[in-house]
Amino acid sequence: MEYFKNVPQIKYEGPKSNNPYAFKFYNPDEIIDGKPLKEHLRFSVAYWHTFTANGTDPFGAPTMQRPWDHFTDPMDIAKARVEAAFELFEKLDVPFFCFHDRDIAPEGETLRETNKNLDTIVAMIKDYLKTSKTKVLWGTANLFSNPRFVHGAATSCNADVFAYAAAQVKKALEITKELGGQNYVFWGGREGYETLLNTDMELELDNLARFLHMAVEYAQEIGFEGQFLIEPKPKEPTKHQYDFDAASVHAFLKKYDLDKYFKLNIEANHATLAGHDFQHELRYARINNMLGSIDANMGDMLLGWDTDQYPTDIRMTTLAMYEVIKMGGFNKGGLNFDAKVRRASFEPEDLFLGHIAGMDAFAKGFKVAYKLVKDGVFDRFIEERYKSYREGIGAEIVSGKANFKTLEEYALNNPKIENKSGKQELLESILNQYLFSE
């Protein structure tokens, strides 16, 4: 059965094309710096937003029209979604997809029944993977939707819930390995608190670390060689989440001796919810060798929640890819479109239009970022700006030779301090030149 009959194979036609079902900037086979653009970007489709989101919001009923809506049995729906998914993957020619365990198969009455459902759908996906060019970027477990996780999963006050969450992650790790997943993600949507009046924060954080160590041990036991990732987010659905931002997660991993096993999966909209630029989170992760993968989306700056829009801001995609290029490119990670069509964009074809928009935006951003890095535009300015640390007293500070006494002596004998302009306006103008040069 063909689920998206009105959508052709999506191909590159160039920036002058008026075809909505064509790439304008993303030419997957274009060679840049010795390898195809598709290998630089490593695009991925998010199974949840693309195939399970129905358009429900706190004020209204579902709006999405999907070709599998006529099915009523949850397993029939799950099977139809797999068929539709691989049709979409093929027509978009994306190299990867990501999933939660509960995205691909429905939850049963018991954990055994749920695992049986998973086994059925995983077997079906494995058959598709034998002939598909699309592979699994990462898998994860949904430890936030079911009411059992009302108080958290690994940080729940109820040890029975901790045990259930462990069993669920055990199974999710197994199927991610079985499907050839290159990474495994932890996102703690319910790992946090609503009020400290009823919260043992110390125990919760200790338990979260215990949980992650158990995951590492089991992954090693079964031979899973994928990269473990944690995805920071400051809030929503929980008031305060422990994985608040890149720095918070890094500190947590360092404290509990987990940093050698984990990297970060940075999401644009989560960064803005934490009060940071997307580039800030990427930069922090990169300079600490913690940048593993990216959830590509954007938020609405006028709204205070996670809108998960398709990324269409070229400035944002350029600065994001600047950080990726500066780190030497992705290893096992990629650009996963953790994005959903708007509630009013309810037609099946909109799923393709959203991905085309995001893929074009990141392709354009990559090309601009590559030129910025190659030309050393910002590097030269930064090198000049900090040159005082390469000579004289600055070199002594950096080398560790200086101390408060020597610095005081220097300051007493150097009464005149001269600062130079940061030239922010000039640099932003230069960035615009590169953005609009094509």
UniProtKB/Swiss-Prot annotation:
Coiled coil: none annotated. GO terms for cellular component: cytoplasm. Its cofactor is Mg(2+). It comes from the Bacteria. PROSITE patterns: XYLOSE_ISOMERASE (PS51415). Signal peptide: none annotated. It catalyses: alpha-D-xylose = alpha-D-xylulofuranose. This is Xylose isomerase. It comes from Thermoanaerobacter pseudethanolicus (strain ATCC 33223 / 39E).
